[in-house]
């Protein structure tokens, strides 16, 4: 009996080692660019931006950059400003890294910090905490003589 054909497709996989290395290379370079270059935008003036992760496409031509503004305030405005200056940042990135193609940059707000804070608050809820604490075993199943 024949196995069902997957029509030449492999099952979905995570990023390759090449993508992971390129993502880290781009992340480190962007951190240096943010530290050294002045971006003329009133929204970005005086704002420190943390680059938390960079995900690179399999062909290394596109990079999604996850950022978190220090303090988490005005995150949407900061992300919009970074996307407006993506070409400027890509130009500096091309001079800072050695890849065949400099990836196009798309900036997104990293929601993982907010999600972690929400989960921590949820676990501190007394109703949830009572379900998380171990209960002493019940002796009701034992026969009493």
Curated annotation (Swiss-Prot):
Subcellular locations according to the entry: Cytoplasm
Basic residues bias: start-end ranges: 1-10
Short name of any one Pfam family annotated for the protein: RBFA
Annotated spans, Disordered: 1-21, 124-145
GO cellular component: cytosol
Annotated GO biological process: maturation of SSU-rRNA
Source organism, top-level taxon: Bacteria
Main location as per UniProt: cytoplasm
GO MF annotations, alphabetized: ribosomal small subunit binding
Keywords associated with the record: Cytoplasm, Ribosome biogenesis
Subunit structure: Monomer. Binds 30S ribosomal subunits, but not 50S ribosomal subunits or 70S ribosomes.
Family membership noted in the UniProt record: Belongs to the RbfA family.
Function: One of several proteins that assist in the late maturation steps of the functional core of the 30S ribosomal subunit. Associates with free 30S ribosomal subunits (but not with 30S subunits that are part of 70S ribosomes or polysomes). Required for efficient processing of 16S rRNA. May interact with the 5'-terminal helix region of 16S rRNA.
Official protein name in the record: Ribosome-binding factor A
């Amino acid at each position: 009996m024949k196995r069902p054909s997957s029509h030449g497709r492999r099952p979905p996989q995570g990023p390759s080692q090449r993508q992971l290395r390129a993502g880290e290379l781009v992340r480190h370079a962007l951190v240096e660019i943010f530290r050294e270059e002045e971006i003329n935008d009133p929204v970005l003036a005086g704002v420190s931006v943390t680059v938390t992760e960079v995900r690179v496409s399999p062909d290394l031509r596109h990079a999604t950059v996850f950022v978190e503004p220090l303090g988490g305030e005005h995150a949407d405005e900061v992300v919009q400003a970074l996307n407006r200056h993506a070409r400027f940042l890509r130009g500096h990135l091309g001079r800072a890294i050695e890849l065949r193609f400099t990836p196009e940059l798309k900036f997104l707000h990293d929601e993982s910090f907010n999600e972690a804070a929400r989960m921590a608050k949820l676990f501190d809820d007394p109703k949830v905490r009572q379900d998380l604490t171990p209960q002493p075993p019940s002796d009701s199943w034992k026969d009493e003589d």
